[in-house]
Amino acid sequence: MKPSIYSLTRQEMIEWAEAQGEKKFRAAQIWEWLYRKRVQSFEEMTNLSKDLIAKLNDQFVVNPLKQRIVQESADGTVKYLFELPDGMLIETVLMRQHYGLSVCVTTQVGCNIGCTFCASGLIKKQRDLNNGEIVAQIMLVQKYFDERGQDERVSHIVVMGIGEPFDNYDNVLKFVRTVNDDKGLAIGARHITVSTSGLAHKIRDFANEGVQVNLAVSLHAPNNDLRTSIMRINRSFPIEKLFAAIEYYIETTNRRVTFEYIMLNEVNDGVEQAKELAELLKNIKKLSYVNLIPYNPVSEHDQYSRSPKERVMAFYDTLKKNGVNCVVRQEHGTDIDAACGQLRSNTMKRDREKALVENVQP
């Protein structure tokens, strides 16, 4: 199976071209065709020799993904189900924000973190996505708009789709550097957010990388007992270890950390828990920000329900009174398979049911 050319960084592209006996500027031409002109085949690279195009075709594909399903919401959200070369499925989501087009990318097939409220973890991790498969998600979303003649450009990226990004650390870092490259898509580092469920040692590594992207931490609870009950990862990285890493990140980068907090009715959404959260954040208030997330119910996790608006606002008001910067996240795509992993999970379920029916037919 040939790799995607998107898996190469610009420096790797230069090294590849030189290994083929080509001049360095040929790599720059290929890079421009891919990321500025956004072609989908090597034959469209009209200033390259036939010999070089043949070498590219022999060693690479352009986009390794196949679009299976597209769901469009009334609010402009678009959810994509993509098929990987090995037949596995992933999700990507485009969200229209007041500041531009934001794409949420997937980094793994399945997830091993085991959050008890999440559709992504219903299917265990099967493999990591490589850098090219992550980049390809952005390129296919952009192609979706290019083909419609819509003069819109992906401006923001959130690495918050299926999987734990820091469990696929090297590929995610390579992806960030590829989409941030000023000769390519040139998506600003401060327009890119990488999320983690709390791999403390990787947060420390990330602090030392020198990348200027944003960090978000899926917290979802203000104490160890509650967090362990809804997020299995807290057994390995309890809040004390997690916050030591977060404080190291802030001291090293002087960058703000966003805390994601999903609102589960009568589980983690009480005023006392808001006070606990404010106390937990007291030493990093100036460089922290809490994102309160309305819960999208998942049929497989029917023990949870969405917090009523009055409970959300009481939680929000308590944080504000205690000096915590926070916001209630705007919802997107509530009229489609909105929860992370839900479209993929529902599609796989339908595919299994279809296969069973076909197998029993005479």
Swiss-Prot record:
Binding-site residues, [4Fe-4S] cluster: 111, 115, 118
Family annotation (SUPFAM superfamilies): Radical SAM enzymes (SSF102114)
Coiled-coil residue spans: none
Cofactor note: Binds 1 [4Fe-4S] cluster. The cluster is coordinated with 3 cysteines and an exchangeable S-adenosyl-L-methionine.
Entry-linked Pfam families: Radical_SAM, RlmN_N
Keyword Phosphoprotein found: no
Catalyzed chemical reaction(s): adenosine(2503) in 23S rRNA + 2 reduced [2Fe-2S]-[ferredoxin] + 2 S-adenosyl-L-methionine = 2-methyladenosine(2503) in 23S rRNA + 5'-deoxyadenosine + L-methionine + 2 oxidized [2Fe-2S]-[ferredoxin] + S-adenosyl-L-homocysteine; adenosine(37) in tRNA + 2 reduced [2Fe-2S]-[ferredoxin] + 2 S-adenosyl-L-methionine = 2-methyladenosine(37) in tRNA + 5'-deoxyadenosine + L-methionine + 2 oxidized [2Fe-2S]-[ferredoxin] + S-adenosyl-L-homocysteine
EC number: 2.1.1.192
Residues given in the record as S-adenosyl-L-methionine binding sites: 163-164, 195, 218-220, 296
Residues annotated as the enzyme's active site: 91 (proton acceptor), 340 (s-methylcysteine intermediate)
Disulfide-linked positions: 104-340
InterPro entries per the UniProt record, alphabetical: Aldolase_TIM, Methyltransferase_A, RlmN_N, RNA_MTrfase_RlmN, rRNA_lsu_MTrfase_RlmN/Cfr, rSAM
CDD domains membership: Radical_SAM
GO molecular function: 4 iron, 4 sulfur cluster binding; metal ion binding; rRNA (adenine(2503)-C2-)-methyltransferase activity; rRNA binding; tRNA (adenine(37)-C2)-methyltransferase activity; tRNA binding
PROSITE patterns assigned: RADICAL_SAM
Keyword terms, alphabetized: 4Fe-4S, Cytoplasm, Disulfide bond, Iron, Iron-sulfur, Metal-binding, Methyltransferase, rRNA processing, S-adenosyl-L-methionine, Transferase, tRNA processing
Biological process according to GO: rRNA base methylation; tRNA methylation
Name the record gives this protein: Probable dual-specificity RNA methyltransferase RlmN
Species assigned in the record: Streptococcus sanguinis (strain SK36)
Lineage, top ranks: Bacteria, Bacillati, Bacillota, Bacilli, Lactobacillales
